[in-house]
Amino acid sequence: VQLFGKSRYEILNRMSTNKMVDMQQDEGRATIFITANARIIDRVVAYNRDDHLLILTEPGRNPWLRDFLQQNVFFGDDARVVDITAETQMSGLHGANADVILQECGVPVDGVQAMHGISSTIADATIYAVRRKEISNHHWQIMTGKSDAATVYEAIFEAGQAHGLVPAGGLTYN
């Protein structure tokens, strides 16, 4: 889900638990949406892109988030909610060699801190790769257009062969 407009930070800030203002370029922050009774509805990570916030939900939660955000944009707010789920594909790359594999695909990951992202290309396809907090090793989420998803997956898989990359369903682990 993307949130555009001058009020994007304030809207997310007032509707969730974390401070969502004054974010650096490509910085990501986790936040939680709760009910009036303090029950957790969803945990998301919002990344500050050039002209919008890219909000990554838990699997299957994007329709709820889109509707929730749209219901809470008030008169005077400068905001527009766009659900890009149908046009994008998300995959993961995890493990000790994840950084090396992405670098071999042409993604300059050195210097990308945890909870930050980078725009790049893999096999001439535009991607946005976000470094998640390390669980046991390097952990990346890679978003690309659906039409480029197979090409990106194949390029990552090919680069990973020398490093023991093993695909695991919709996610790629090594």
Can you name each region flagged by the protein language model?
Residues 1-174:
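Basic, glycine/lysine-rich polyanion-binding surfaces/domains
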